[in-house]
């Protein structure tokens, strides 16, 4: 490989690293809302998986404790799935056009 080619690869790697850092910061600051019970329970979570807010519909206050616990858990799980999907989508859009070896996934 020629020196110019190696320098180009190094520059490309540095640019990719900068893009990855920016993407990770954007994801960390993003907020998603997970829901369950047809919207009766909603959980707002950051990309860092920090729960910022839980909203319960007033009609749930008469429900059995176990039902409420299940709905909250389902809403949290929904939020986590949305964060993971957003991360996969951003990574895929960022790496589109890159020729990665088969089976190689980012972030490493």
Swiss-Prot record:
<keyword id="KW-0963">Cytoplasm</keyword>
<keyword id="KW-0238">DNA-binding</keyword>
<comment type="function">
    <text>Binds to DNA and alters its conformation. May be involved in regulation of gene expression, nucleoid organization and DNA protection.</text>
</comment>
<dbReference type="InterPro" id="IPR004401">
    <property type="entry name" value="YbaB/EbfC"/>
</dbReference>
<dbReference type="GO" id="GO:0005829">
    <property type="term" value="C:cytosol"/>
</dbReference>
<comment type="similarity">
    <text>Belongs to the YbaB/EbfC family.</text>
</comment>
<dbReference type="InterPro" id="IPR036894">
    <property type="entry name" value="YbaB-like_sf"/>
</dbReference>
<dbReference type="GO" id="GO:0043590">
    <property type="term" value="C:bacterial nucleoid"/>
</dbReference>
<feature type="compositionally biased region" description="Polar residues">
    <location>
        <begin position="85"/>
        <end position="96"/>
    </location>
</feature>
<dbReference type="Pfam" id="PF02575">
    <property type="entry name" value="YbaB_DNA_bd"/>
</dbReference>
<comment type="subunit">
    <text>Homodimer.</text>
</comment>
<feature type="region of interest" description="Disordered">
    <location>
        <begin position="85"/>
        <end position="108"/>
    </location>
</feature>
<dbReference type="GO" id="GO:0003677">
    <property type="term" value="F:DNA binding"/>
</dbReference>
<protein>
    <recommendedName>
        <fullName>Nucleoid-associated protein PSPTO_3645</fullName>
    </recommendedName>
</protein>
